């Protein structure tokens, strides 16, 4: 399991916040989400996991235009990383010049595992999904998305083409302009002649032929930002899952999570699978 840690943590942070930040509650929500995902009885996957890797933003793209997080956000993030390491023996990936989704892509393509589950709420990472071994678990839907679902949602023929679709319609969340005035229906028409067996370069070339010259600069500028970098140096392999004794959970100040943790510990350390 390779986790887009910033996506998971940000959701927990803002869900915990009412008026003022609530770091302890944010920690509990983030850790509880991971415990639910590790438990085959609650993860809606029905599968166990033997290795984990959490990928964090080391740099924020200034083009996204997002406001700076408060100091407590970053301090709590470091506490969460430490707790996850103690609880699960997990590995963490972070690079000062790259965002977490690039680290996820690098780790996914480097892995030789039979099945890889990407955990994220970021639509950009859907482009890594394949029918065979790479699966996208959506934190928003709380389920693994099928390839057919992703293709239908974005009007494409393969998940790897999401970057092209986003370069056309834009993405206000990441401040990506796209082609002004072009939306999902335009993507659907542009992809009518695209087939699932076409390689990525051929897809871009075919779409390029249908884009008026005055829009091509916007398209390629946006495409450069929607593509994932899968060659980030120094990304570690996912680490074997090693769970601490449940008695130690209370000592970490996580008393409310003891029950959920104990169940996961029992499944992985007592029950055969």
State what each model feature region is.
Residues 1-86:
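Domain-level signal for Mg2+-assisted phosphodiester chemistry and nucleotide/NA-binding surfaces
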Residues 3-8, 14, 26, 30, ...:
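Metal-dependent nucleotidyl/phosphoryl-transfer cores and adjacent nucleic-acid-binding surfaces
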Residues 8, 54, 61, 65, ...:
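A generic signature of intrinsically disordered, low-complexity regions enriched in glycine/proline
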Residues 55-57, 240-243, 260:
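A cross-family glycoside hydrolase active-site/sugar-binding cleft signature
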Residues 71-239, 255, 259, 264-271:
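Extended two-metal-dependent nuclease catalytic cores across DNA- and RNA-processing enzymes
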């Amino acid at each position: 399991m390779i986790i887009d840690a910033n996506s998971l943590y940000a959701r927990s942070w803002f869900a915990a916040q009412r008026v003022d930040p609530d770091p302890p509650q944010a920690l509990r929500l983030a850790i509880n989400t991971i415990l639910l995902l590790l438990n085959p009885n609650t993860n809606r996957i029905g599968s166990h996991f033997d290795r984990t890797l959490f990928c964090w933003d080391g740099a924020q793209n200034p083009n996204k235009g997002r406001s700076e997080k408060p100091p407590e956000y970053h301090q709590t993030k470091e506490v969460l990383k430490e707790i996850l390491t103690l609880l699960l023996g997990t590995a963490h990936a972070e690079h000062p010049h790259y965002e977490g989704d690039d680290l996820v892509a690098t780790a996914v393509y480097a892995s030789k595992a039979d099945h890889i589950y990407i955990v994220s709420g970021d639509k950009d990472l859907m482009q890594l999904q394949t029918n065979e071994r790479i699966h996208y678990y959506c934190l928003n839907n709380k389920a693994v998305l099928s390839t057919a679902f992703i293709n239908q949602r974005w009007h494409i023929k393969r998940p790897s083409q999401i970057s092209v679709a986003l370069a056309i319609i834009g993405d206000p969340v990441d401040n990506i302009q796209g082609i002004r005035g072009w939306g999902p229906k335009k993507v659907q028409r542009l992809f009518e002649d695209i087939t699932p067996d076409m390689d990525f370069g051929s897809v871009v070339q075919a779409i390029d032929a249908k884009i008026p010259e005055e829009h091509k600069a916007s398209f390629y500028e946006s495409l450069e930002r929607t593509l994932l970098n899968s060659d980030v140096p120094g990304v570690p392999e996912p680490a074997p899952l090693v769970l601490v004794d449940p008695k130690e959970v209370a000592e970490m100040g996580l008393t409310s999570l003891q029950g959920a943790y104990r169940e996961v510990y029992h499944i992985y350390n007592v029950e055969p699978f």
